[in-house]
Design a protein with these regions (language model features):
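Short, flexible, glycine-rich and Lys/Arg-enriched loop motifs at helix boundaries
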Residues: 72-82, 105
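A structural motif detector for beta-strand N-caps
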Residues: 1, 7, 13, 19, ...
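Internal nucleotide-binding/catalytic subdomain
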Residues: 99, 105-107
Length: 116
């Protein structure tokens, strides 16, 4: 499991085997990060955060409780195509936010810029 040795992961969180966790990340209790996710350096996940799918979160981003990131698109035309979610650096994702990957009709990628 490529988790940088400076990162701190709460014992009640689940990080799947191929997930990549950068330097100085803090992952609070009851978080889930699936195998295709990349968290760059200095990411902080507060409790109860779920990150799945082909998702990249840029450095120095904070994610507050109950955020749901990278789950299947809500577009009813989605049929399991390869999609991704890219979140830039220095972002603040607040409580109970849902951010989904793109759909085939929109190019398959959702991108969020920096400092949002």
């Amino acid at each position: 499991m490529p988790i940088h040795n400076t990162s701190i992961i709460h014992s009640n969180s689940l990080i799947e085997e191929n997930a990549i966790i950068g330097k100085n990340c803090k992952i609070g209790p009851f978080c889930y990060v699936s195998s295709d996710c990349v968290l760059e350096d200095n990411i902080e996940l507060f409790s109860h955060v779920s990150i799945v799918g082909k998702t990249l979160i840029g450095k120095n981003t904070k994610v507050w409780p109950f955020a749901s990131i990278g789950h299947y698109p809500q577009d009813l035309k989605y049929k399991g195509e390869n999609t991704e979610l890219i979140i830039g650096t220095y972002n603040k994702i607040r409580e109970s936010v849902s951010i989904n990957p793109g759909t085939k009709g929109g190019g398959g990628t959702t991108k969020i810029g920096n400092n949002c």
